[in-house]
Amino acid sequence: MTPEHLPTEQYEAQLAEKVVRLQSMMAPFSDLVPEVFRSPVSHYRMRAEFRIWHDGDDLYHIIFDQQTKSRIRVDSFPAASELINQLMTAMIAGVRNNPVLRHKLFQIDYLTTLSNQAVVSLLYHKKLDDEWRQEAEALRDALRAQNLNVHLIGRATKTKIALDQDYIDERLPVAGKEMIYRQVENSFTQPNAAMNIQMLEWALDVTKGSKGDLLELYCGNGNFSLALARNFDRVLATEIAKPSVAAAQYNIAANHIDNVQIIRMAAEEFTQAMNGVREFNRLQGIDLKSYQCETIFVDPPRSGLDSETEKMVQAYPRILYISCNPETLCKNLETLSQTHKVERLALFDQFPYTHHMECGVLLTAK
């Protein structure tokens, strides 16, 4: 695979290899055949980041080869959304001959939605001033004249200039209902929107008929907790990043959801609060003991669950675990399988043509 060529003819083979690999990794814990969810074969990434290479009067997007560290020029990127590809061409054309916008520009980040909105961030090794803002506004207006629904942001050390806004609103059809998700620039969002829809619908399917409340750790912008709210009496969710918490609160209101409570704290802190080890001012007015959480949902970082959180989740009858790293999932399962068994197993091809796998497991108490 090269940045400008996807081996789409190999899609089925690479997916089959992942299925075999996941089954092998999960063999000590389950003999289930994974439910497999396919990605679009191209234009599946909704975000992308590129370094900018200055070559005399020219400049262009590059990425670095992971093995050799050599730079690779990228003029088109079929893994990314069609909107990102349109913007890549338009941004280079708009910046190349503009001394103010191109001077010390070293990176461009793109974030797009299925609803055809975009935020483009230009990163600089220089101070950004009013002249930069004027030129950036002219570029933004020129892009919009090309029917590109785009918001521009300038970033430099300790500086962020959002010309209009630093977010876009995604609209996803999830099990017959449109979900609105505010996505903030430089915050985590699911990179493959088509796969995200399938992950949300799978999570809804495995939790249908649930009793009681749901607890979610690492909720981000509320991606899962808001979609799952329809299956539970109440949802209690934690997140540490301020922009994500603010986006989650917006998303609760935008989706007219009244049974989700977001708390800004780390999973480790929440564990201490639940166990009565510490009291937190942030929890004033929230009666943790009133929640009857029968199900806990975790979507941890690549490092997986820490040992304290492992112990905490074992107290719940049902554990729904979405993993972006099956190796750390299996490490966690060495502990979790002592008290729980795997009921459902899914493979989500979030990153086609790469080694990476995303998977989901539903665990129930033995």
Curated annotation (Swiss-Prot):
Extract the GO molecular function terms from the UniProt entry.
Answer: rRNA binding; tRNA (uracil(54)-C5)-methyltransferase activity, S-adenosyl methionine-dependent; tRNA binding
What is a single Pfam family found in this protein's UniProt entry? Answer: tRNA_U5-meth_tr
Q: In its UniProt record, which GO terms are filed under biological process? A: tRNA methylation
Q: Which UniProt keywords apply?
A: Methyltransferase, S-adenosyl-L-methionine, Transferase, tRNA processing
Which residues of the sequence carry a binding annotation for S-adenosyl-L-methionine?
A: 190, 218, 223, 239, 299
Tell me the SUPFAM superfamilies matching this sequence: S-adenosyl-L-methionine-dependent methyltransferases
EC code: 2.1.1.-, 2.1.1.35
Active-site residues, as the UniProt record annotates them: 324 (nucleophile), 358 (proton acceptor)
State whether keyword Phosphoprotein applies. Answer: no
Keyword Cell inner membrane belongs to the record? no
Catalytic reactions of this protein: uridine(54) in tRNA + S-adenosyl-L-methionine = 5-methyluridine(54) in tRNA + S-adenosyl-L-homocysteine + H(+); uridine(341) in tmRNA + S-adenosyl-L-methionine = 5-methyluridine(341) in tmRNA + S-adenosyl-L-homocysteine + H(+)
CC annotations in GO: cytosol
By its UniProt entry, which InterPro entries does this protein fall under? Answer: MeTrfase_TrmA_AS, MeTrfase_TrmA_CS, SAM-dependent_MTases_sf, TrmA_MeTrfase, U5_MeTrfase_fam
Q: Which Gene3D superfamilies match?
A: 2.40.50.1070, Vaccinia Virus protein VP39
Question: Any coiled-coil ranges, and where?
Answer: none
Main EC class the enzyme belongs to: transferase
Top-level taxon of origin = Bacteria
Family listed: Belongs to the class I-like SAM-binding methyltransferase superfamily. RNA M5U methyltransferase family. TrmA subfamily.
- What is the stated purpose of this protein? Dual-specificity methyltransferase that catalyzes the formation of 5-methyluridine at position 54 (m5U54) in all tRNAs, and that of position 341 (m5U341) in tmRNA (transfer-mRNA).
Protein's recorded name: tRNA/tmRNA (uracil-C(5))-methyltransferase
Q: What is the organism field in this record?
A: Escherichia coli O157:H7
- Gene expressing this chain: trmA
